[in-house]
Amino acid sequence: MAGAKEIRTKIASVRNTQKITKAMEMVAASKMRKTQERMSASRPYSDAIRKVISHIAKGSIDYKHPFLTEREVKKVGFIVVSTDRGLCGGLNINLFKTVLNELKTRKDKGVDSVLGLVGNKAVSFFQSMGVEIKAQVTGLGDTPAMEDLVGIVNGMIENYRNGEVDEVYIIYNRFVNTMSQKPTVQKLLPLPELEDDDLENKGSWDYIYEPNPKVLLDSLLVRYLESQVYQAIVDNLASEQAARMVAMKAATDNAGNLINELQLVYNKARQASITNELNEIVAGAAAI
């Protein structure tokens, strides 16, 4: 059995670790709430653009934008959104399993894939997998800006325009609630048709196009894709903070259990030491 002094040192060390994990849990909870507010604030913008795009597309019968047109799929582009940091449980591992499953499904159909990566964890993981990587962005922090995403979004858009890829998807962790984050595959291009009752009622909307529907759709579609990628990244950030909060709470609880176990061992060691001292005193008295 370890000595009492050694056990006290271990208890002090675990208590220090417990303080750190408790602080990280509280910080993650605060960041998660702020990220949820950004999620709620950005969603109406992308929803409004999506409806306007659908209105214009349905009203322009003589023009079909390539971003809205299905074509034979020979190559698929995936934007993968991961975290820059760890200590968030199995969040990234579950995401990467989903990505690998999507890549395998396409490969089995004879379809090639190319990746655009967001986050250090995705970059370090997929660079060792031998997958074609077109673009990557890291270090977005807790408050990503839209301009930080322009490169990776425009890169995939150009690949789609040039016919280098025939579909574009984004894969990220969708925030369900504090205890649940779900890896999600969302199609970006070609844009899925919006199911909305008011789209059928042409009398409820009417636009005069300046200069023309093509130019307007070009601009709106790019803005919409940027907003969708931004929304996915913010969603993933909320998932990261929730997963980190849960992981740090588990670590804090485990530290508390370990302290209790060490305290019990310390008490036994202390009791044994006192018993030995008493035995020595009794033995000495008997010898006299």
UniProtKB/Swiss-Prot annotation:
Outline what the protein does. Answer: Produces ATP from ADP in the presence of a proton gradient across the membrane. The gamma chain is believed to be important in regulating ATPase activity and the flow of protons through the CF(0) complex.
Which Pfam family, just one, is annotated for this protein? ATP-synt
Query: Which top-rank group of organisms is this from?
Result: Bacteria
Keywords for the protein's UniProt record, in alphabetical order: ATP synthesis, Cell inner membrane, Cell membrane, CF(1), Hydrogen ion transport, Ion transport, Membrane, Transport
Answer whether the UniProt record assigns the keyword Transport to this protein.
Answer: yes
The record, for InterPro entries, names:
ATP_synth_F1_ATPase_gsu, ATP_synth_F1_gsu, ATP_synth_F1_gsu_CS
Q: Which HAMAP family match?
A: ATP_synth_gamma_bact (MF_00815)
Respond yes or no to whether keyword Transport is given for this record.
Answer: yes
Xref: CDD domains: F1-ATPase_gamma (cd12151)
Q: Which organism is it from?
A: Glaesserella parasuis serovar 5 (strain SH0165)
Q: Which cysteines are joined by disulfide bonds?
A: none
Location of the protein in the cell: Cell inner membrane
What the record says about family reads: Belongs to the ATPase gamma chain family.
Which protein are we looking at?
Answer: ATP synthase gamma chain
What Gene Ontology molecular-function terms does this entry list?
Answer: ATP binding; proton-transporting ATP synthase activity, rotational mechanism
